[in-house]
């Protein structure tokens, strides 16, 4: 097979592919690993369940893009329906559909991983060149404020009125026109995602990418591994054939749900696999203004209030919360608002008058990925009382900010909705109980389910990513993180994957 991108939906799949390294997952971690290992002269095959979408294929249409770019059409959730679990299913992974934010791992997190989890190799000093390289790979920059949506400006206006510390966020845009549909992919290819950077560099170095390829099991032993794959149809929902990839090594980088799912289906790894899940939940908050805001025009997420982050937390490395401006398309926003019928129509009639934020709140390990009887993932999560309390505090501060910016009312879109019209209403937020299926809590930064540790007694993978108890199986994605990276995970994933891939390349060359 000579194609550098082989679409299994387009022709009869080959019975077998051969490689030195088979990588499962083409997102930030997988594409970066493919780039490094291919440039080291290794034969690399990368498996991706989704399709390849760039340029005009990214239609900006909610129903089409959610169907094709998101796992389970964006409907994946915890078992109790309390948290929506957003994950990419596309060549290039979640970096294709994120809000372009470039947020490195805070120094306090590296220190915490050293001190508490025994990962002495991951010092801030040792990881600094890899973090810097990640920023280069992403063309990290501060976008022109003329391209910001007004929602960002209103958040900053309110923060400054209250004397709160905030900052413009780094992004990975080049040639942005401010279309505002980042969460559905960029049809201008302005987002310098893994698809446009790492995948292309890996292809140039000889790596092959296989799309519409669902990895279902890892078999074999030692240096003779085999990944069993189902070929999918053009829409990615029906199997149309099977093949296998024969490889010396397998690197799993499929995300913190799919990686443990594949290990559990394969009977690989120790009892830590699937445990220690962190979802880093985010709570949306919406503000309504008398004047038009048109927050859907321009970059949706460019400013964050950082006043309430705490880098020196002894237990977690980074704690507190961030308040980050955001905006979605009508399809996205309508699913988050708590009304139905005529009330929903009235609310969406105010779409041009609203601004929104996400309250990003790092969590401690408190969830698990297990298998349903049919092999699909079962995601359970214990939403800790302490985390709920930080959500309430974050909502209180965000409401104060929007009121200071001139909002007529601020709403947490729970059922029933909690609406704040003045600071005298802030105590209403104490009623937020976050019961399952009552509040649209989101997770876009899943971590921790194949925890990296200094010994098998404390985790599932070694500091070099090698799965404890197995030869020839490695994990390079956010599943490894022993505690929350406390940031948007694209940049951490690129940083850590490059570090691990360079180590692996050196080992294989020796």
Where are the predicted features?
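Extreme N-terminal leader/targeting segments of oxidoreductases
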Residues: 1-21, 39, 498, 506-510
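Glycine-rich loop(s) and the adjacent beta-strand/alpha-helix scaffold that form part
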Residues: 36-39, 43-45, 50-55, 60, ...
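Rossmann-like flavin
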Residues: 91, 95-176, 359
């Amino acid at each position: 097979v000579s194609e550098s991108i082989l679409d299994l939906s387009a022709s009869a799949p080959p019975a077998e592919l051969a490689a030195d390294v088979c990588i499962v997952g083409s997102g930030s971690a997988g594409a970066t690993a493919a780039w490094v290992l291919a440039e080291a002269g290794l034969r690399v095959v990368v498996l991706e369940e989704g399709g390849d979408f760039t340029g005009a294929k990214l239609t900006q249409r909610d129903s089409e893009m959610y169907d094709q770019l998101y796992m389970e059409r964006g409907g994946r959730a915890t078992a109790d329906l309390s948290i929506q679990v957003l994950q990419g299913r596309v060549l290039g992974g979640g970096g294709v559909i994120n809000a372009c934010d470039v947020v490195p791992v805070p120094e306090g997190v590296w220190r915490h991983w050293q001190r508490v989890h025994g990962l002495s190799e991951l010092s801030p000093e040792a990881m600094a060149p890899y973090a810097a390289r990640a920023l280069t790979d992403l063309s990290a920059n501060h976008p022109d404020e003329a391209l910001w949506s007004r929602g960002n400006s209103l958040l900053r206006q309110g923060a400054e009125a209250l004397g709160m510390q905030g900052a413009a966020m780094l992004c990975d845009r080049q040639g942005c026109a401010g279309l505002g549909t980042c969460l559905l992919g960029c049809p201008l290819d302005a987002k310098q995602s893994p698809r446009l950077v790492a995948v292309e560099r890996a292809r140039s170095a000889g790596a092959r990418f296989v799309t519409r390829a669902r990895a279902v099991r890892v078999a074999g032993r030692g240096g003779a591994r085999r990944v069993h794959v189902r070929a999918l149809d053009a829409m990615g929902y029906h199997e149309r054939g099977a093949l296998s990839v024969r490889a010396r090594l397998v690197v799993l980088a499929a995300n913190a749900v799919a990686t443990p799912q594949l290990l559990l289906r394969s009977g690989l790894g120790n009892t830590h696999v699937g445990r220690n899940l962190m979802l880093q939940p985010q709570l949306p908050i919406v503000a309504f203004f008398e004047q038009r805001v048109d927050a859907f025009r321009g970059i949706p997420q460019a400013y964050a209030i950082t006043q309430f982050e705490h880098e020196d937390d002894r237990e977690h490395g980074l704690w507190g919360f961030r308040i980050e401006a955001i905006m979605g398309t009508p399809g996205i926003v309508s699913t988050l608002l708590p009304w139905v019928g005529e009330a929903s129509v009235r609310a969406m009639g105010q779409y041009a008058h609203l601004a929104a934020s996400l309250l990003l709140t790092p969590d401690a390990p408190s969830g698990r990925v297990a298998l349903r009887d049919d092999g699909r993932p079962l995601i359970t999560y214990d939403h800790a009382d302490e985390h709920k309390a930080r959500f309430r505090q974050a909502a209180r501060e965000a409401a104060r900010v929007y009121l200071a910016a001139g909002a007529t009312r601020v709403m947490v879109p729970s059922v029933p909705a909690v609406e704040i019209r003045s600071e005298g209403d802030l105590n209403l937020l104490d009623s937020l109980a976050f019961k399952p299926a009552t509040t649209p809590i989101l997770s876009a930064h899943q971590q921790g389910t194949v925890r990296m540790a200094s010994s098998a007694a404390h985790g599932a993978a070694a500091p070099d990513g090698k799965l404890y108890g197995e030869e020839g199986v490695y994990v390079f994605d956010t599943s490894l993180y022993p505690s929350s990276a406390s940031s948007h995970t694209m940049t951490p994933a690129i940083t850590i994957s490059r570090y691990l891939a360079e180590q692996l390349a050196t080992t294989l060359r020796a």
